[in-house]
Amino acid sequence: MKVLFVAGDPKPERWTVPIKALLPEAEVHVWDANGPAVDADYAIVWQPPEQLFEREKRLKAVFNLGAGIDGLLAVPNLPPQLPIVRLEDAGMSAQMAEYVLHQLLEASRGMETYREQQRQGTWKIHRPIKRSEWPVGVMGLGHIGKRVARTLAGLDYRVNGWARSKHDLDGVSTFSGTENLTDFLQSTRVLVNTLPLTDETRDILNHKHLSQLMPNAVVINVGR
């Protein structure tokens, strides 16, 4: 079995050495733009060049180093029947949930106001926030979107979720399809986008949709 690593990492040994340790029977190669074909069975890629598919004609599957595959699908000569395997999580969902929570707290608790008061050496008490005044809407209920929604719902935030297809999540009010998008947006003050970039989602964060959010809305974009 031959494995080809094509990810543009300046230190590919960070990947190839562990792969070789886990697959001692495999030949592990690093992509060389000026080199010959290695007749790889599998390629591990991140935004691969077109030359990969011109040169490597025996590929059985491609493993994408990330959850988003839009960069891979954009390669014009990607064989249409070639199986693609993507990372569903690898710890990213927890990191994204933490990032969203951080940004939500920054906005809802007015942390920049307090930092400015700290710089000025003043102290002024502001009205405590009510979580009920900061309903969160998560666009996209894939692995990352579900993790974000569940994390915030577990902290007693009012959470809405929207996806193209129907989902059921405990503690989350879910909406599906374009026919329910307006209701979702009008019930949302903090919009969290976790959607991938596809033909269906391109430009979905537009003036028409953003203007339907609740007053003084905040957008947290962790998608494409």
Task: Please tell me what each predicted stretch does.
Residues 149, 153:
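Gly/Ala-rich phosphate-binding loop of Rossmann-like dinucleotide-binding domains
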Residues 1-41:
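N-terminal glycine-/charge-rich "phosphate-binding" loop or analogous flexible N-terminal tail
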Residues 160:
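Conserved beta-strand positions in the Rossmann-like core of class I SAM-dependent methyltransferases
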Residues 81, 132-135, 207, 216:
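Phosphate-coordination loops involved in phosphoryl transfer and adenosine-cofactor binding
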Residues 28-39, 50-53, 171-188:
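Short acidic low-complexity segments
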Residues 85, 114-147, 174:
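Glycine-rich NAD(P)-binding loop of Rossmann-like domains
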Residues 41-115:
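Phosphate/diphosphate ligand-binding glycine-rich loop within oxidoreductases
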